[in-house]
Structure formats: structure tokens, C-alpha cells
Amino acid sequence: MKPFKTQAHIHSLDGQMDEITVLEELGNNSYLVDYRGVKCSAIFNPFNSTYYADDIYGIIKEKTNNG
């Protein structure tokens, strides 16, 4: 899947729309997205064709190699 930009409802903006970059599909309607430099989870609602990004509780930390 090639990354692409689209609009999404953003959790920290109380559902207001802003631009995200969809990076990867994780599962059924579940995606890894980038919102202002923060990688977080998002869901896609196929009924209204809208993404919902959770940049509060859905932040995905990068794995680091400590050893």
C-alpha cells in the first residue's frame, strides 16, 4: 500500500477534520496513520467513507533496539 493523504476526524480536535497520511493497513478497517508527526491508529468507516484518527489513546511508539 502506498501512503496517501486524506481528511480524518481527529480525536484531540474533538472530531474536527484535519489532514492525515495513511501509512499502512493493520487489519479490517484499522490503519496506521501519521498526524502531525505522530504515528497513531485510525479506523475507516466504510458507510460514510471517513477515517477517525485517535492521536490521544492510539499513539503507536516506535520499537527501539536496546540491546
Locate predicted features.
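Mixed-charge, Lys/Arg-enriched low-complexity segments
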Residues: 2-14, 54-67
